[in-house]
Amino acid sequence: MAKHHPDLIMCRKQPGIAIGRLCEKCDGKCVICDSYVRPCTLVRICDECNYGSFQGRCVICGGVGISDAYYCKECTQQEKDRDGCPKIVNLGSAKTDLFYERKKYGFKKR
């Protein structure tokens, strides 16, 4: 997700013992490059990103986590798994714009 949306910001703090989770929609993706091939290393996130209501949430989109998150083999070889906590901390302009467009035109979720 972060590869295709440059305005998304990752946490990048020192990871703790908490294991990152992925939702049904994001299941099987590499957290860094969105690749579906060769999952290799388990994702660790910082304690702040796994605290309170954020516990067990998807690392990429914030949905309900159903499976463990993994880095792909290529990101592990390039040592991108050592850059810090990979949790996305902001919404990004696409989701923010969608929210305000819905509000502006009065669309409601079913």
From Swiss-Prot:
Record's protein name: PHD finger-like domain-containing protein 5A
A Pfam family hit: PHF5
GO process terms (BP): mRNA splicing, via spliceosome
Record organism: Arabidopsis thaliana
Highest taxon listed in the record's lineage: Eukaryota
InterPro entries per record: PHF5 (IPR005345)
Family label: Belongs to the PHF5 family.
